[in-house]
Amino acid sequence: MYADVIIDISHEQLDKTFQYAVPDELVDVIELGMSVDIPFGAGNRQITGYVVGLGDKAAYPVEKIKYITGITEGKVTAVSRMLKLAAWLKHNYGCTMNQAIKTVIPVKDKVKQKEKHSVNLIIDAAQAQKYLDTFAKKNAKARYRLLEALIKEPVIDESIIKSKLNITAQTVKAFEDMGIAEVRSEDMYRNPVRNVTGERKRIELNEQQKNAVDTIIADYDNGDYKTYLLHGVTGSGKTEVYLETIEHVLNHGRQAIVLIPEIALTFQTVQRFYHRFGDKVSIMNSRMSKGERYDQFLRAQRGDISVMIGPRSALFTPFSNIGLIVIDEEHEGAYKSETVPRYHAREVACHIAKEAGASVILGSATPSMESYYAAMNGHIQLITLDSRAGSGGLPAVDIVDLREELRLGNRTIFSNRLRELMSDRLAKHEQIMLFLNKRGVAGFISCRSCGKVMKCPHCDVSLTEHADGRLMCHYCGYTTPKITVCPSCGSRYVSGFRAGTEGVEAQVKKTFPQARVLRMDMDTTRGKDGHEKILSEFANGNADILIGTQMIVKGHDFPNVTLMGVLAADMSLYSSDYRASERTFQLLTQAAGRAGRAEKSGNVVIQTYTPEHFSIVSAANQDYNAFYEQEIAYRKLCGYPPADNLMKIMLSSQDEMLLTKGAAWVKAFVDNNCKYKGLMCIGPADAPIYKIKDVYSKIIYVKHKDREVLNSIHEKLDVNIVGNQAFKNINVQYDING
């Protein structure tokens, strides 16, 4: 028997297997996915590899094939299902097998496990008394003191013995040699769930919530494992639906994974789950120490926990019997990996569930176009919650035209309506959230007099300003010189739109000096528990106003917040991205959902230069269907996902001329060798930021209805690029439907 083994090293260009012979004694035990020790290279140094294929045919002369040394012991290994998942990632997202394996195995480097040592008495009371008498006669004070303590308490922590009883390691060793006691060790798992106290009263479900739970549970009990899109308006109680269905799955001896979009959600989310399921819950996030992450991996693997909460990486928790995967706020961009492999957690979750026989719940007040499109086409099941749980109603929304504010002479960041409502809420001792809809480095260019945004005439996305003043489209490469006069109204108030949270904070303190202000952005949340500290302060009423970027509108529930101010809705609306309208609608709807979630009524003020835009109007009305109908028509017209599939090929190099030639070669290869009906290949164009740290980047887009066609193209390209000397100093990456 022969095994195809992939080496446990990370190198983008290394994506091939090595064939090894399987020793007779391992033929009956070796399995796909096992970690094995192998001799490698001319010096036969021992390294670790993974079995990714088994067969009886030798690919090389038999005398040249080396033997596997043995199965790796004592390390976290890639089990068969993880390797199958890695192969699926490779095929669907254009990465190497090594990169896929390192993604699906959460912890690769074994961290030294913390251990707790205790001294245990292993003789009966009569024997202990005899030894005690002997020690008294011999004046062996330390031994007498230790045995006396063990008679009273048969198990004592070793640290107490050394610190409180002043007993040395030699005395403990002597007790072991004499057969009086033994030292036992147990792994100490670091518990990342902190500050969870008290009990939470179980909430009575309303009729819509009950129907949602009953639907999912009935299908589950019948073995009909589906993917559900739980479309619930903000405050409709989606989390209670998650809790009920998870409890049902756990009662059947299976496990659940709950994905959250980013670390800021853990403060409230973990408490709600921990109150229901106790220490069976754990969390995983990027700010945890390596040791903490390793502990959670082991706890899941050994069955000590049943619910894992975390961002997209928590999806790869090694549960043995996964029954349910919940993706809360499924529309969030954070579920898409920005590093290779550029997978989407939603797609991977559905694949894992299909393989494991599990259900998936995708929850959102503003579903992604992909999920809603799938529901409309019958690929997943739609469940709707269209009313708020409890007594909270939807907030009143004002759309303020900033062009009119400018005409009235108001050049501050606060419209008259927002300033008026802020004064009112501060007087009532109610809380306010101010949201700065900020994205990216390069801003869009617009006219402050009439609101016109400079767009690409070919792609219907905003042009991005470069350092030299040129405006460029990063989808097709269209370029135009710097614009100083508005082509629509002739005004010279044409500029890039940029703002910052610090500037907003300064303006708030100047306008409302008596207000207690907190700012939540990347600068103020550095450190392990930065998010939780700020959210806790605000939740406890220690601030009147919370200012922040996207992280403040992601699912937080603050009952005393009755006013949400969106300072500049246009900042995301005109980013150079075909998803700009969708992201704006989602952010504005989520922002509006933060106000008036309890008994108090809420207000939302949306400030914008384009008050008539359909995404802003739909968000103000909380009308998802109206938004979807207009947006899907635009996607179909332009051939963007989910109507079509879009693959972005990214090339980068320190050699600009080499990069230009390489990008031209890729474009020509696709045009000449990938003759699929309906295929479009656009580019190459410069990347949004063409040069970073002396590395130049170009982009090529490939569109087609069939996802498998794009998979086939990136595999064909890989075959021709890997080992090609012309691409030795060019990095090529793929991003599908990013």
Where are the language model's segments positioned?
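Inter-lobe coupling/hinge segments of SF2-like helicase ATPases
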Residues: 199-206, 210, 214, 223-660, ...
